[in-house]
Every structure is written in structure tokens, then in C-alpha cells.
């Protein structure tokens, strides 16, 4: 027994390399076996933490190696006293083994510690709180902190006089969001510390509107203090009458109104006289005449438009204006004749020139007055309205709308947008002018997309072109499409169909504008529709827009040469006739080939029957 538990001397150093190899090979299995046997009695014995274990023989005998002599005596005495030395040795060995593992870290741990110690200690920078100051420079005492909740704010506004919805970096720019945020901070819905920056409240809008664009319903999401039950009334009292808060509703913490919005509904109000054909003898009207002579079958018959302009002409002649005067005014749109008139006026005396200019301007005003009165009294026919509805239906589905926005190439995948539905209402009369309402329900929209869609559809109807021409604007050819006036555009409301399911599961109310229908309709009639009607009757915005298109000749440089930044809208419209002819010729060739191929296929069958 003494030999078995004897302490190894320096003579055993020669066997050390062999011991290390066996130690690496069998150490783990032996220790796990010992732990299983001695686990119930480990707590009954204590042993010094300085013991090391070495494996000396092939039969895996374990020898504790003390660092001090006292520890050796204790161990040998235990082994000589009774017959339980085996259990004691095994238990103490296991105890020491576990303690040795804890006290001797792995080489990788030591390396990590060294690297950590090499790094210089960098204390955390202490950020001092800078209190807000008033106008006199005195610090404003910090208000007690109140709980904030993530909410969805449903609102409506008239965009007249505002530079769009989104707040700008320049504080002097008037925006819808700036007025709303200031009113919320004043009403106590936003703390003074967070009132200086929208990002601190997690501010986000569901849809961004441009300058002059209205919204009957829109949603913003942010963290607000909503303890006060009268918070909506307080905010509305601080806002101008053309901005209203419909409701404030609790949402989940991760709610983002822009990302959670599944689709959006826009409305565009258009006077029906915008769908009338171009003015006779205008630039666009003459181009249509040329193409009708080349392809009479392409353009649809528009006897209604011809009769309407003849009626206007008869009213002008009845007012005392002669046909020569009408022709002179119409030809004044021609650049060459304008130059001739300028040369003639320069040769004439100043007095005569002033008299002629005055009479000419009076004549133009008189003719425009008669034309405007005729436009106001125009009532659209069912066939023209149906044509416009069919053109608007061409936008439904997923298409590449790169031609209906700015700065989007055809290969940009973000130009692909999904239009869910388009609805054109029945005509209605407001203050003597007939209007139609166009609602476009889409998943998302790009900059100027709706205004370009309306302008393109109106041009197709005005020129009596087929509905299928719209599909060619989704191709790779870059086309310059004009924008319809922003006056008639408004956001009806964003839709949260998908997110409302999640809200109802979390015991929250869905985001729905139908419960505010009465208030929203009253607001639209008073602050949106009436302003649109009044501004159109006063400024003649739609009449000026389509009149400009009828007389448009293209941009020119200093030398008078046309500038081509992509194909012109009219070039594409009239090149469509050539494409139709090419497709017709291809179809005719294909049909002729199929007819010729049929008898060729039947000849082998006849020959086979003859042979049989």
C-alpha cells in the first residue's frame, strides 16, 4: 500500500513523456467513471485544493500529489487506518480533480485575459443633460415623466397653402406635419423634450402628399401621452379649421403606419369638359387630322366633339366677331405668323400698335369668355364616359409605371406597382359645371403617378384613340407624359386590412375610417370640394392645362431646334398607328402562312390513301 501511494521523486522524470501521452488519451474516460461511482459521497470528504493528478501505470491508478508534506501525511494515514481507503481515495481524487479544473484555466482563456488586460481602459463618456430654455434664455424645469403609448392618429386636411404633408428641414416652410406636431406639443400630448424632434416620438405617416394635395383621411403613428380624455378636442382647438383630427387609437408597440398600410385610395375630381377634343385648327388638332387621313380606321368617330365646337363657333359669330378675326386669333398660335405680326407691328406707328393690341386682347377675352361659358354648360355623353371608364380599367393589375413618375428607369423593380381597382363615378353638377370623381385603389404610388395617369387617360379620350394604347406606356420606351393639375387630387384614406386582423387578435379596435364618414363628408364638401370648384371657376386651371397641351410644340434651344429628352407624348401617340399597321401586316402574313400550310399537310394523307 505504501508503494502504491508513495510520492514520485525526481527519478521518475524519465518516464514523463510516456505518461503525458497516456494522459491525453484516457484522462476523460477515467474521470467520468470516477464521478459516477463517487457522486453520492463527494460531500462527505474535503481535500486540499493544491492536489494534482498524474497517471503513472497502464491500469489507470490515481495518485494524489501534494505540494506540502502535511497533505501527504493526511492522505497516507487515511489509507492505513481502515479498509475504506479505496473509497476515500476515489472520492478525494474526484474532488481535487474538479477543483483543479476550476483553478487551472485553459490556454485560450489565458490568452483572452492577456488580450483584455492589454486593452486600455476607456471610461464611458458621461452625457450631461442640457435643459430647454425659454425665450429669455432661462432653463425650463423638466416636467414629470408621463407614460406614452403607441397610437394611430386619423386625420384629414386641405392642402391649399401648404408645401406638402412632410415636415421640411427649413422651419419657415409651412407643412401639415409641422402644424400638427406643434399643436400636439402645446396640448400636452408630446413632452417638451420630445417636441423639438419628430424622431424622438417615432413619428411616421402612412401616405405623403405633395404641395396643394388634400387628404380626407390619412394616418400618422407615434408615441403620445393620451391620459387626457379631451386630448382630441384640445388638439383640434389649436389647429386651423382646414386640419382635423378624427380619432386617436391604441396600437401595438411595433406599429408603423407606412409599413403596415396594405393599400391606399386616391380620388381625383375632373371637370367633364376636359374630355372634349382639341380646339379646331390648334397644333394638336392638325396632327390628328393628318393621322386620320393616313389611318381612318384607327381613330374612333367623334361626332359629338365636332358638333360641340361648331356650336361654340356659331355663338362666337353671333356675338359680332367675324370669321376673319377668329382665323387671325387661331393663327396667332403659329410661330411664323407671330413673327410676321411682330415685324408688321414694329413698322407701324406706336399709337396704331397700341390700338391694335388693345383691340386684339379684347377680342381674345371675348372669345375666351364664350368658350368658358360653353365649357361650363357641357354635359358628357354616355358613350364618351364609357370610353373614359374603359381607359381607366387598363391601369388595373401589376404594371411597370416608370413612364408615370420621375427618375425611374424601366429596369428599376420599384417601378412595378399594383393597381387594385379604378372607379369612375356618374357625373354631378356643382355651380353649373359638371364633374366626375375618379377613385384609384392601389397598393402603393410613386411621385406624380396619379396625375400622369389621369392626364394620359384624358388624352386618349380627347384624341379618340383605342383603349389598348395605354398598355404601350408600360413598355421600355421612355415617354414624357404631362401631369394633370394637382387641384383635383386628394387622398381618400389608407387601408389597413392585413394589420387590422392583428389588432383584433390583440384586443384593439381596427383602424377604420367608416365610423367617421359623416364628419369626413362634411369636411370634404366645405374645405376640399368647395375650394376645388371655386379655384377652378376663378383661375380656369383645367382649361389652361388642356389648352396648353393643344398648342404645345415642344421645347426648343437657343437656336430654335427642338430638344428631345425622350419621345414626346404626341410622337408616341401617333407612332402607335404605325405599330398597329405593322401588327396588322404581321397578322395577315401569319394567316396567309397558315392557310398555305393546311393543304401541304393534307397532301401526304392523300398520297398514302392512293398507295393503299
Swiss-Prot record:
Residues 111-122 have a biased composition (Basic and acidic residues). It comes from the Eukaryota. Residues 64-82 have a biased composition (Polar residues). GO terms for cellular component: nucleus. The active site is at 210 (nucleophile). It holds the Pfam family PseudoU_synth_1. Its cofactor is Zn(2+). Its main location: nucleus. Keywords: Isomerase, Metal-binding, mRNA processing, Nucleus, tRNA processing, Zinc. Coiled coil: none annotated. One of its GO terms (biological process) is mRNA processing. The keyword Repressor does not apply. The keyword Membrane does not apply. Residues 1-21, 64-122, 330-352, 583-612 are annotated as: Disordered. Binds 1 zinc ion per subunit. Its EC number is 5.4.99.-. Formation of pseudouridine at positions 27 and 28 in the anticodon stem and loop of transfer RNAs; at positions 34 and 36 of intron-containing precursor tRNA(Ile) and at position 35 in the intron-containing tRNA(Tyr). Catalyzes pseudouridylation at position 44 in U2 snRNA. Also catalyzes pseudouridylation of mRNAs. PANTHER family: PSEUDOURIDYLATE SYNTHASE (PTHR11142), PSEUDOURIDYLATE SYNTHASE 1 HOMOLOG (PTHR11142:SF4). Belongs to the tRNA pseudouridine synthase TruA family. This is tRNA pseudouridine synthase 1. It comes from Candida albicans (strain SC5314 / ATCC MYA-2876) (Yeast).
Amino acid at each position: 500500500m505504501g508503494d502504491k501511494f508513495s510520492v514520485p521523486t525526481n527519478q521518475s522524470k524519465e518516464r514523463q513523456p510516456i505518461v503525458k501521452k497516456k494522459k491525453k488519451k484516457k484522462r476523460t474516460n477515467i474521470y467520468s467513471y470516477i464521478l459516477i461511482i463517487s457522486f453520492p459521497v463527494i460531500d462527505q470528504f474535503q481535500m486540499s485544493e493544491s492536489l494534482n493528478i498524474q497517471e503513472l501505470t497502464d491500469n489507470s491508478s490515481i495518485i494524489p500529489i501534494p505540494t506540502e508534506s502535511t497533505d501527504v501525511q493526511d492522505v497516507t494515514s487515511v489509507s492505513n487506518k481502515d479498509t475504506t481507503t479505496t473509497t476515500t481515495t476515489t472520492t478525494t481524487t474526484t474532488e481535487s480533480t474538479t477543483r483543479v479544473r476550476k483553478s487551472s484555466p485553459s490556454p485560450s482563456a489565458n490568452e483572452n485575459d492577456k488580450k483584455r488586460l492589454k486593452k486600455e481602459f476607456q471610461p464611458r463618456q458621461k452625457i450631461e443633460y442640457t435643459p430647454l430654455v425659454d425665450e429669455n434664455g432661462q432653463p425650463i424645469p423638466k416636467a414629470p415623466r408621463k407614460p406614452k403609448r403607441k397610437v394611430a392618429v386619423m386625420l384629414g386636411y386641405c392642402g391649399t397653402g401648404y408645401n406638402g404633408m412632410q415636415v421640411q428641414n427649413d422651419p419657415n416652410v409651412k407643412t401639415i406635419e409641422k402644424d400638427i406636431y406643434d399643436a400636439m406639443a402645446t396640448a400636452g400630448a408630446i413632452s417638451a423634450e420630445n417636441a423639438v424632434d419628430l424622431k424622438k416620438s417615432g413619428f411616421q405617416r402612412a401616405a405623403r402628399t405633395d404641395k396643394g394635395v388634400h387628404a380626407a383621411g390619412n394616418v400618422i403613428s407615434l408615441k403620445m401621452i393620451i391620459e387626457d380624455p379631451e386630448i382630441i378636442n384640445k388638439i383640434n382647438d389649436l389647429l386651423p379649421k382646414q386640419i382635423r383630427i378624427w380619432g386617436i387609437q391604441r396600437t401595438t408597440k411595433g406599429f408603423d403606419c407606412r409599413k403596415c398600410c396594405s393599400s391606399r385610395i386616391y380620388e381625383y375630381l375632373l371637370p367633364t369638359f376636359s374630355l372634349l377634343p382639341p380646339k379646331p385648327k390648334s397644333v394638336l388638332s392638325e396632327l390628328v387630322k393628318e393621322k386620320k387621313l393616313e389611318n381612318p380606321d384607327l381613330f374612333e368617330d367623334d361626332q359629338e366633339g365636332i358638333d360641340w365646337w361648331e356650336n361654340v363657333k356659331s355663338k362666337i359669330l353671333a356675338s359680332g366677331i367675324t370669321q376673319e378675326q377668329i382665323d387671325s386669333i387661331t393663327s396667332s398660335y403659329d410661330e411664323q405668323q407671330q413673327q410676321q405680326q411682330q415685324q408688321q407691328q414694329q413698322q407701324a406707328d406706336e399709337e396704331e400698335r397700341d390700338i391694335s393690341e388693345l383691340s386684339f386682347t379684347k377680342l381674345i377675352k371675348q372669345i375666351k369668355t364664350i368658350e368658358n361659358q360653353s365649357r361650363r354648360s357641357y354635359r358628357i355623353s354616355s358613350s364618351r364616359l364609357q370610353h373614359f371608364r374603359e381607359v381607366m380599367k387598363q391601369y388595373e393589375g401589376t404594371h411597370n409605371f416608370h413612364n408615370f413618375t420621375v427618375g425611374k428607369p424601366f429596369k428599376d423593380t420599384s417601378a412595378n406597382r399594383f393597381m387594385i381597382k379604378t372607379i369612375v363615378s356618374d357625373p354631378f353638377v356643382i355651380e353649373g359645371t359638371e364633374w366626375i370623381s375618379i377613385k384609384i385603389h392601389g397598393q402603393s404610388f410613386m411621385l406624380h403617378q396619379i396625375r400622369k395617369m389621369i392626364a394620359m387617360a384624358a388624352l386618349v379620350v380627347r384624341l379618340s384613340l383605342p383603349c389598348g394604347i395605354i398598355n404601350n406606356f408600360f413598355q421600355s420606351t421612355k415617354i414624357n407624359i404631362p401631369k394633370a393639375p394637382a387641384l383635383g387630387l386628394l387622398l381618400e384614406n389608407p387601408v389597413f386590412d392585413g394589420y387590422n386582423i392583428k389588432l383584433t387578435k390583440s384586443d384593439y379596435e381596427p383602424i377604420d375610417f367608416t365610423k367617421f364618414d359623416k364628419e369626413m363628408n362634411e369636411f370634404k364638401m366645405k374645405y376640399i370640394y368647395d375650394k376645388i370648384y371655386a379655384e377652378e371657376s376663378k383661375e380656369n386651371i383645367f382649361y389652361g392645362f388642356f389648352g396648353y397641351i393643344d398648342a404645345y410644340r415642344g421645347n426648343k434651344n437657343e437656336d430654335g431646334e427642338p430638344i428631345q429628352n425622350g419621345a414626346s407624348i404626341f410622337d408616341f401617340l401617333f407612332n402607335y398607328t404605325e405599330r398597329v399597321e405593322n401588327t396588322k401586316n404581321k397578322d395577315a402574313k401569319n394567316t396567309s402562312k397558315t392557310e398555305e400550310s393546311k393543304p401541304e399537310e393534307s397532301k401526304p394523307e392523300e398520297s398514302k390513301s392512293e398507295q393503299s
